[in-house]
């Protein structure tokens, strides 16, 4: 009864419990090793390794152009809970695509929930990626009226949590 209505803990939570028990790196140390600007060519070469591109820009910017296979979790909003839900593995190596001037903020906010394996960020953002011939993907955004008048062979997938659905 006491726990009724509470959300399940995020998937990264057990890892954070271990971090709290065993200790973790100082914030300055994490920032120093993570705050690395990477050229588009360097990022492209790293895609062959097991790295995850985390795009933390606005949903509008991500929709217009993003690196194929990148994961979108915008800095504005419920960043930490979504990071924990989507990324799960705190040991993942991350490369950031961030709004200019907010790279350090993203690194700090990731480290607060145990994700401190940021390799660096894409220098010059997505425009440098495009300028250097990098492939991009786009997301089609439609209004409800556009969706309802378009092809009837579409399905809606509700991905809200139980608590979100109730409200």
At which residue positions do the language-model features occur?
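Accessory recognition modules or surfaces
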Residues: 83-90, 128-138
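Active-site neighborhoods of enzymes that stabilize oxyanions during catalysis
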Residues: 130-155, 160-165
């Amino acid at each position: 009864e006491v726990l009724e209505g509470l959300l399940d803990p995020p998937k990264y939570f057990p890892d954070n419990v271990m971090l709290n028990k065993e200790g973790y790196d100082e914030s300055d140390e994490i920032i120093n090793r993570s705050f690395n600007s990477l050229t588009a060519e360097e990022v492209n070469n790293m895609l062959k390794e097991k790295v995850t591109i985390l795009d933390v820009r606005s949903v509008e910017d991500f929709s217009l152009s993003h690196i194929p296979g990148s994961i979108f979790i915008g800095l504005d909003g419920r960043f930490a809970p979504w990071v924990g839900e989507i990324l799960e593995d705190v040991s993942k190596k991350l490369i950031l695509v961030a709004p200019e001037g907010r790279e350090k903020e993203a690194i700090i906010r990731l480290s607060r929930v145990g994700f401190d394996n940021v390799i660096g960020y894409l220098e010059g953002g997505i425009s440098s990626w495009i300028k250097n011939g990098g492939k991009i993907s786009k997301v089609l955004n439609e209004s409800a009226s556009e969706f309802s008048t378009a092809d009837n062979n579409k399905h809606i997938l509700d991905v809200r949590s139980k608590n979100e659905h109730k409200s």
